[in-house]
Amino acid sequence: VTRTVEPAEWADMGVPLLASPREVVKDLHARHLPSPPTAVVAAYDPDGRIRASASFAFRAGVVDGWERRNALLSHLRRVIPHDLRLRRPVRTAVLMVCRDGASGWTSEDGAWMWGLRDACTLHGLRCGSYVTLTRDGWHVVGENRAGRTPNAAHHAPADAASGQPQPGRQPIRSASAR
């Protein structure tokens, strides 16, 4: 059984487009300062504001979406309650994977995409965009939107690396902190 999604299948799924992908990538990068291999999953409210996010290191080379889904579900459950009680999902999950290698699609990306889609179904979220972050820059799979910065080689400012909130940014809160 192959638990992976090809780019064409992803594009046909009707994943909602990011209104401002550059801002989403910059914000997630600034909040989590990912370096390879790190995944950042975020849940967005209908108004486009980030509700919760989590980042975690992952084992490279995994091409089975089952493992990726389990990791995503584990981290989503820690930062935001499920929305399974709703008839339709209102929050959208976005996944940014910071990895080594070329910026093009890989079978690992396919496993992440399958995992994101399934984790969203099981957590009551809409499946949102899948973004890769490499040394070449970022790329939103299925949308053909990309940029050079931030990238996997981009170093954070000293105050951000210290763990202090950056001026003008709200610290990330889990949904239970409300």
Spans of model-derived segments:
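Short, solvent-exposed loop/turn segments at secondary-structure junctions
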Residues: G101-T106
